[in-house]
């Protein structure tokens, strides 16, 4: 009834988040959700003021697509931008929408 997939979550600076979402689609994601993200971490507190807004991008993908996306993030975004990403296992109804 459910399909085992990966949830990839990326939190990135507003300036680069749309490009990351574009890369995710190009690498095989069938869609994504992007919302404002507020919080605090190693680079200080992000309150969502102009110029310091972070966006959270979520996509449900296959393991193979998740690996491609993580490799792209590691090579092209982590060295230059305040960006973080993580993967989680998810069980999805209507899994055909994601693969």
Residue ranges of each PLM-predicted region?
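Positively charged, small/polar-rich N-terminal and surface patches that mediate targeting and assembly
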Residues: 1-99
């Amino acid at each position: 009834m459910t399909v085992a997939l990966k949830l990839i979550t990326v939190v990135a600076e507003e300036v680069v988040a749309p490009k990351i979402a574009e890369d995710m689609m190009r690498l095989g994601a069938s869609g994504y959700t992007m919302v404002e993200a507020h919080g605090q971490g190693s680079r200080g507190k992000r309150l969502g003021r102009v110029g310091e807004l972070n966006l959270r991008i979520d996509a449900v993908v296959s393991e193979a697509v998740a690996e491609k996306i993580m490799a792209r993030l590691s090579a092209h975004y982590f060295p230059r931008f305040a960006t973080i990403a993580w993967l989680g296992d998810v069980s999805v109804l209507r899994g055909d929408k994601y693969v």
